[in-house]
Swiss-Prot record:
Any Gene Ontology biological process: protein targeting to lysosome
Tissue: Expressed in the outer nuclear, inner nuclear and ganglion cell layers of the retina.
Signal peptide bounds: 1-24
Lineage of source species: Eukaryota, Metazoa, Chordata, Craniata, Vertebrata
GO cellular component: cell surface; collagen-containing extracellular matrix; extracellular space
Subcellular location: Secreted
Record text on subunit structure and interactions: Homodimer; disulfide-linked. Component of a complex, at least composed of TSPAN12, FZD4, LRP5/6 and norrin (NDP). Binds FZD4 with high affinity. Interacts with LRP6 (via Beta-propellers 1 and 2).
GO molecular function ontology, one term from the record: protein homodimerization activity
Alphabetic keyword roster: Disulfide bond, Secreted, Signal, Wnt signaling pathway
Limits of the CTCK domain: 37-130
Cysteines joined through disulfide linkages: 37-94, 53-108, 63-124, 67-126
Any single Pfam family the record assigns to this protein: DAN
Annotated function: Activates the canonical Wnt signaling pathway through FZD4 and LRP5 coreceptor. Plays a central role in retinal vascularization by acting as a ligand for FZD4 that signals via stabilizing beta-catenin (CTNNB1) and activating LEF/TCF-mediated transcriptional programs. Acts in concert with TSPAN12 to activate FZD4 independently of the Wnt-dependent activation of FZD4, suggesting the existence of a Wnt-independent signaling that also promote accumulation the beta-catenin (CTNNB1). May be involved in a pathway that regulates neural cell differentiation and proliferation.
Name of the protein in question: Norrin
Length: 131
């Protein structure tokens, strides 16, 4: 009988621990948050397209995710027979907000060294898309 009470107490504590954890990563706000516009890191190999250089692995970042504003297009009303822009559109894109210039040197055949440059994304945000 004593073992059954202990097992029931442990089961109840486990249930409370599981129920108490529902506000963390299983919450729908977390799922929405994980899809928002944000910076994602990845590793890529950089090599020169023409010269025979040793490639280098580099940590890069990209902006990816959804913006909360809805996209839409609506017709423009005009009293002209020619409509240069028949629609007004609005949309928001996940784009880099801040970045910094980075460089790396590749060793090539014949002792030559080439410098590759790229922008490393520091932060991302939603902004109106350009046409």
């Amino acid at each position: 009988m004593r073992n059954h009470v202990l097992a029931a107490s442990i089961s109840m504590l486990s249930l409370l621990a599981i129920m108490g954890d529902t506000d963390s990563k299983t919450d729908s706000s977390f799922l929405m948050d994980s899809q928002r516009c944000m910076r994602h890191h990845y590793v890529d190999s950089i090599s020169h397209p023409l010269y025979k250089c040793s490639s280098k692995m580099v940590l890069l970042a990209r902006c990816e995710g959804h913006c909360s504003q809805a996209s839409r297009s609506e017709p423009l009303v005009s009293f002209s027979t020619v409509l240069k822009q028949p629609f007004r559109s609005s949309c928001h894109c996940c784009r880099p907000q801040t970045s910094k210039l980075k460089a790396l040197r590749l060793r090539c055949s014949g002792g030559m060294r080439l410098t590759a440059t790229y922008r490393y994304i520091l932060s991302c945000h939603c902004e109106e898309c350009s046409s």
